[in-house]
């Protein structure tokens, strides 16, 4: 949810034209990499934590996944079984998302640099906003506050 507030001014209300939603949500599969090493979740952790309880409903994805991914959370690096999204790949058959996959989910350009540790990257991506959404909102705000581009 994004809330935009404007100070009252002459002329009254601010009207925004909301775009039509997409008929189909974007799918994650096209952003998933294969053959990734170094992000694997151990078999032990998979067996005793992720799949142990009935309340755990991790989202398992792969390149053929044709559905939206769960929201990234800042605690993703802690391997949350309730909110986690994991990739069917890697040395143990299950791994965490890569930096490039996280960037794609959040709408960051592929060339965007994240010069921090993997844990910090997960925290930053989980606390981030979707770049395409903010781009549209910023454009609307600019058009409203600066009529006719002046």
Language-model features, listed with the residues they occupy:
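Short, surface-exposed, polar/charged, turn-prone segments marking secondary-structure boundaries
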Residues: 12-14, 31-32, 97-103, 143-144
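FAD-binding beta-loop-beta segment adjacent to the flavin cofactor pocket
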Residues: 77-116, 121
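Acidic-aromatic/histidine active-site loop/patch
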Residues: 134
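Short, hydrophobic alpha-helical segments
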Residues: 138-149
């Amino acid at each position: 949810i994004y809330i935009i507030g404007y100070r009252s001014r002459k002329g009254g209300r601010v009207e925004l034209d909301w775009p039509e939603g997409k008929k189909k949500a974007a799918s994650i599969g096209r952003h998933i990499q294969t053959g990734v090493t170094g992000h694997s979740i151990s078999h032990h952790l998979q067996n005793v934590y992720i799949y142990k309880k009935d309340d755990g409903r991790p989202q398992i994805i792969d390149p053929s996944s044709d559905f939206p991914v769960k929201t990234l959370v800042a605690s993703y690096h802690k391997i949350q079984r309730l909110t986690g999204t994991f990739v069917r790949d890697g040395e143990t058959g299950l791994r965490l998302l890569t930096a490039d996959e996280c960037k794609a989910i959040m709408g960051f350009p592929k060339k965007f640099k994240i010069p921090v540790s993997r844990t910090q990257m997960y925290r930053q991506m989980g606390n981030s906003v979707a770049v395409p959404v903010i781009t549209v909102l910023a454009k609307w705000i600019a058009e409203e506050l600066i009529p006719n581009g002046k």
